[in-house]
Amino acid sequence: MLSVILGFATSLVYGTADFFGAIASRRLKPTLVTGISAWAGLLFLSSMLVSGLFQATFSPAAILWGIIGGVFSAFGLSMFYRALAIGPISILSPLSALVAGLVPAIAGAFLGERFGWLSYVAIALVLVAVFLVGFVPGQDVRLPSPQGVLFGIGAGVGIGVVLICLHNAPASSGIATVILVRLINGLVLGGYVIFQLVTRRVAASTFKGLGPKPWLTMLATGVFDSGANLLFVLGVRQGSLTVVSVLTALYPLGTILLARFVLKEKLALSQSIGIALALGATALLAF
């Protein structure tokens, strides 16, 4: 039951990170927000080590999975933004989340994870809920292009592989793999931000006159994203990769709930149904 709680909490915290990232992206390009928040997340993880709340042992296995996870994290995010740029977001965003949950679930099956029939029903309901929660219907909804679908699937695969890497890291390594994933992600995306500035694709004046709010939202994005990584690692060390991963894929839930209560945005009927399915399926998995 604890792993179910941690998996569901992971989805809410990831969703909170996406919410703050979306707010920051109103003033800056998403790639800039992601690059800066990656380093904010690394600072947060470093503070966890210094405070003694977590420990990290950089064993060969932890380093290997951290490097692989960091590369796929950068890959998944780049594919995700490409998919959103092509659109439609209302289809490609939940598609990415669905694939991100399926990839670790398939890996879990290969690792020999088996469940009772009720748990399989609950897992299937969660995957349906993942798509419904992220899907926003409307009159202007169009079918995605093959290229958009490819980028959406690529984003989900990248995120899913990161979850597998975090699961495969030795428990004795503490949060070493999480730190390495964040470090490599920060180097790749932070390097891209520097490249944008050097080549003047983004003017340095972009950051002038921003005020504290965008910087605080980027800081929050990195902190919540790294916090979700920690919760996921704690979850898979307590229970099943499949269960924790499919619950983690519900991360759009946290985003839309904050949008509903903070920004007063209305929920579509499909999203309300998805939320109900998610809560019901989570209860089934817990009991």
What residue spans do the PLM features occupy?
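Juxtamembrane helix-loop boundary signature in multi-pass membrane transporters
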Residues: M1-F8, G101-V157, K266, S270-F287
